[in-house]
């Protein structure tokens, strides 16, 4: 009689172990995103995305209290419990050392929550924090490993970062300024080398000026909803047809793959009959209402502009099509001749004409980043 060893694989049931999609994306966007919120600031940002239907979300933190305060399912929270209840404080090295030991567990959590149907991963963080700034590099590495695992190539172009810069008040702390300067510099280098795409910069000091009367309670919620909301508009409209001009999903994907920094903005158009109204609004948008500033727009490699208005506006405003075309041409000129992808959409709920702008492939805003050095002691 032959003595054949029993193998564990004999008990493997392919039907039973087939990976299930544990969380379904509900954003309705052209691309399926998985969102990772690193640290307190990143967790808040991830929660804003989660509320807009980006349900493939994981929050990662070294402090249990920060995770407890996030209203997302507990199984979508990952505690790097290396430093007790208080987490890493502002110590990024501490957080980095802690998450490196948990790399495999983080990867397993990605597999569990994200499943296999993901087009891109977006990692959100505040660059000055311990948890966010300290864990981001390991999270980027794990995100790329995850894409390789599910059989997707060009992984560098599929992992993006949303990084927020601290307010001037926060930067008055030398530790905050040092963390922010070092981490943002490093992320910009990764983006410019095409190792991540895109790097979306959010300048909390700039946004504070856009919303000068915000209460403390509403400040972070408003900022994060603005960021996630703007991002969501482009993803959703790229999934919708228009009887005027459709913003194509392939064009949207190509913009998201550009190496370098990306900025977003929105503004409404006044005096619609004026032939320069749309171009003036776009110019104002690029100069005033973007979520970060200090960029040389002529370094852009890609841009998108979407105009949204009601049926009444499109039907009754004489010469509006020419004005919109002139606006698109203005954006192309301001961005150094970058390819501008266009969209014109009707929305019954809009009683005004609104322009949404996305500019990608930008070189870093050196002056803003270097400005953090003045706070260093």
Where are these regions (language model features)?
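Tubulin/FtsZ superfamily GTPase core signature
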Residues: 1-377
